[in-house]
Amino acid sequence: MKLALLLPWACCCLCGSALATGFLYPFSAAALQQHGYPEPGAGSPGSGYASRRHWCHHTVTRTVSCQVQNGSETVVQRVYQSCRWPGPCANLVSYRTLIRPTYRVSYRTVTVLEWRCCPGFTGSNCDEECMNCTRLSDMSERLTTLEAKVLLLEAAERPSSPDNDLPAPESTPPTWNEDFLPDAIPLAHPVPRQRRPTGPAGPPGQTGPPGPAGPPGSKGDRGQTGEKGPAGPPGLLGPPGPRGLPGEMGRPGPPGPPGPAGNPGPSPNSPQGALYSLQPPTDKDNGDSRLASAIVDTVLAGVPGPRGPPGPPGPPGPRGPPGPPGTPGSQGLAGERGTVGPSGEPGVKGEEGEKAATAEGEGVQQLREALKILAERVLILEHMIGIHDPLASPEGGSGQDAALRANLKMKRGGAQPDGVLAALLGPDPGQKSVDQASSRK
């Protein structure tokens, strides 16, 4: 605790000793006028010097932003070139590649000097001196002088002691703590009847703790203007402007000089004609590059020229008669198999046939049915393997058409049970008996 109290006191004493050495800071009038300080010539001769001697330069470190080059970028720029001569023409568009630097925002530390109050002074004009060791010692001396005068006044006002040894009448003075303030005089009894003799002055007491922090000072003056930052990168190239109006046509130039005399003409019997020549104008002032045609009546006479180039081909002639038929070509490949047509409507139910003879037993009938089914299966397998030609049309009533239909159904729907296959392929016994009866008739 004592160390914490002594450290601020030691700092204050060091600052006061530095200020008490009488350091003076002479500044130019231009620097003071820049920050709004009064001129040294205004007022009395000593007032100007006293108003600026408490200002000092303080080094302040600031962080400012700046742009730093960070590589480069390639940009393709479109360039429009307008017409360089009057009249209608197309604008020329070209492209060029530009390499320009790129920038990024960076921060740097800048050290600048600012005018502020010197250590130990405050206020708007730095004329208020802070509490320091010098002022504290002056106040201590003044307090010691005042205490000595008070003691002299107390000794002069003290009454003489009585001649006899009788004790003075005692009164009931209020309780007073003499150990806390031994030399203090109570206000209730300013003149006691009997007091102890005044002893010698004691040593000065210890310095008390520092007082509370004072209120914040006034706002400082405005600092100097910062340095001008670097120039920013160039902006993008703007779009080309609109096409200008065509200029006025120039004045016609003066007539050219007469040409040289021509050759003498041929005889009157020679053919006559007109010669057209293109001669550029002699006027170069207006920059007109158009060609002017001049018609000169001249008599042509000379040998016939070379043969001209052949003319363009004529239109195609009429279509000729058809030629004889050619030899028959080779037989083509077999076409793809067509899709299966839709199933036809069921036929009309036939007439009821004669009843079959019941002489045959049931075992023989079942054996026949089994043999028939076996034969049909063999035929189906032959068709699947390709022994029989699938394009050949089977004869009606031979049983091959039924086997072929069963083969197609099996290919589309897969294998079916034997009973279902027998029911789809083979006719019933009644139909068989009807067929036998019709064959007998």
UniProtKB/Swiss-Prot annotation:
It is found in: Secreted, Extracellular space, Extracellular matrix. Residues 1-20 form the signal peptide. Its main location: secreted. Hydroxylated on proline residues. Residues 200-215, 231-243, 252-269, 306-327 have a biased composition (Pro residues). Residues 52-128 form the EMI domain. Disulfide bonds join C56-C118, C83-C89, C117-C126. The keyword Nuclease does not apply. The gene is COL26A1. Keywords: Collagen, Disulfide bond, Extracellular matrix, Glycoprotein, Hydroxylation, Repeat, Secreted, Signal. It holds the Pfam family EMI. Glycans are attached at N70, N132. This is Collagen alpha-1(XXVI) chain. Residues 156-362, 390-441 are annotated as: Disordered. It comes from Homo sapiens. Homotrimer or heterotrimer. One of its GO terms (cellular component) is Golgi apparatus. Residues 348-357 have a biased composition (Basic and acidic residues). GO terms for biological process: positive regulation of cell-substrate adhesion. Residues 199-267, 302-355 form the Collagen-like domain.
